[in-house]
């Protein structure tokens, strides 16, 4: 189950990161990217909701995702005018990626109830680094861009189609046989770093707290900077740096989740956002430096890559930690839908970078630094203010 979901996530990665690096170079294509991100973020919410309630089977959801994702990549491979690309890539491709993302996350979280956030973090990492081979191929040989996207379309349709055939939800109240539920529930080390919520929140209750909008704002700011980094690093022409950036974007997610189990979600999220902000400052220095620009570029890529994707699974795990596990999927889907605003923010930064790249990177640094400062102040909703959690 896990490896099929991971492969499906990797297959949709070129739709976001491949397009952002290779094709988002002017206002029209940047607008298409923003629409795609909005559709992908919005598509994940109903997909997860319908799959969780049994109104849409995992097979049907992923089969539709396979067809639409393949269509979106094919539309990117052979652009036939802005309106057609808008429908094929941005609208249908974005919806297809959202279906795959939502279904795979729900299936993996259900099969691994003892460590749902860590496992989901691993498969969302594939959504980051899955585009690295395409970026290297098309980056080294720009004339092969259409062929690379066409191959990605065929692979996406095939891989997600196979996942649709085999992925399924576990039985109700599933728990793995090799994990003692009592020992897991009373694990002092786990409770110290991931405290239990005050109660199990329903979606309507979570929407009335201050914590949920704060998480959505953090995701919006960090998500905008993450996508913007792919665009701005691709503009340097260093395709090895772009590939490393997206690879670290994915790998950093699993590393951050491991660290969060030791140091706590909020502390690691603050560190991740700080690294993302530091990456922007290094990249801004690189684009203005007369000497040493290469070293600064690579340092910026490392920091921006490690911070540019890790916040996604950390926010997902914080939703579970703060609001409870019963409706965590629905609540996180609402938070994740804020990625639609992140896409618009990324495009705004990219448009600014066309004329003033250093200023755009400094603005991105501020956009990442503000939530980094606010993250340690996140509190468990429902507890009295005198309790320091």
Q: Regions from the language model: what does each represent?
A:
Residues 10, 84-99, 220, 295-310:
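Hydrophobic core of transmembrane alpha-helices in multi-pass small-molecule transporters
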Residues 13, 67-80, 275-291:
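C-terminal ends and interior cores of transmembrane alpha-helices
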Residues 146-166, 359-377:
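Symmetry-related core transmembrane helices of the 12-TM Major Facilitator Superfamily/SLC fold
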Residues 322-355:
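A late C-terminal transmembrane helix in Major Facilitator Superfamily
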Residues 19-24, 201-257:
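Extracytoplasmic gate region of multi-pass secondary transporters
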């Amino acid at each position: 189950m896990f490896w099929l979901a991971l492969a499906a996530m990797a297959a949709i990665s070129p739709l976001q990161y491949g397009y952002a690096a290779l094709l988002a170079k002017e206002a029209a294509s940047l607008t298409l990217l923003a629409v795609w991100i909005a559709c992908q973020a919005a598509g994940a919410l109903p997909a997860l909701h319908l799959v969780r309630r049994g109104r849409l089977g995992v097979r049907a959801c992923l089969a539709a995702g396979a067809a639409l994702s393949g269509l979106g990549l094919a539309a990117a491979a052979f652009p036939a005018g802005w309106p057609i690309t808008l429908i094929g890539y941005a609208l249908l491709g974005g919806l297809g990626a959202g279906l795959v993302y939502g279904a795979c996350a729900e299936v993996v979280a259900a099969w691994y109830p003892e460590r749902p956030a860590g496992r989901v973090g691993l498969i969302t990492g594939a959504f980051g680094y899955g585009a690295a081979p395409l970026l290297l191929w098309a980056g080294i040989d720009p004339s092969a861009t259409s062929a690379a996207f066409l191959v990605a379309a065929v692979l996406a349709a095939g891989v997600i189609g196979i996942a649709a055939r085999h992925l399924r939800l576990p039985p109700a109240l599933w728990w793995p046989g090799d994990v003692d539920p009592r020992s897991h529930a009373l694990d002092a080390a786990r409770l110290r770093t991931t405290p239990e919520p005050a109660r199990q929140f329903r979606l309507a209750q979570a929407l009335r707290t201050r914590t949920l909008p704060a998480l959505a704002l953090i995701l919006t700011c960090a998500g905008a900077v993450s996508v913007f980094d792919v665009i701005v690093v691709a503009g340097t022409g260093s395709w090895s740096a772009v590939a490393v950036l997206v690879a670290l974007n994915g790998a950093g997610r699993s590393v951050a989740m491991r660290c969060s189990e030791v140091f706590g979600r909020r502390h690691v999220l603050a560190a991740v956002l700080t690294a993302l902000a530091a990456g922007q400052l290094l990249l801004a220095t690189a684009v203005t430096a007369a000497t040493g620009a290469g070293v600064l570029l690579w340092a910026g890529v490392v920091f921006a890559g490690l911070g540019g994707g890790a916040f996604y699974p950390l926010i997902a795990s914080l939703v579970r930690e703060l609001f409870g596990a019963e409706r965590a999927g629905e609540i996180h889907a609402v938070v994740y839908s804020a990625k639609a605003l992140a896409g618009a923010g990324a495009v705004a930064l990219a448009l600014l970078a066309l004329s003033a790249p250093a200023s755009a990177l400094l603005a991105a640094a501020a956009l990442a630094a503000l939530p980094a400062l606010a993250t340690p102040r996140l509190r468990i909703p429902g507890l009295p203010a005198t309790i320091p959690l």
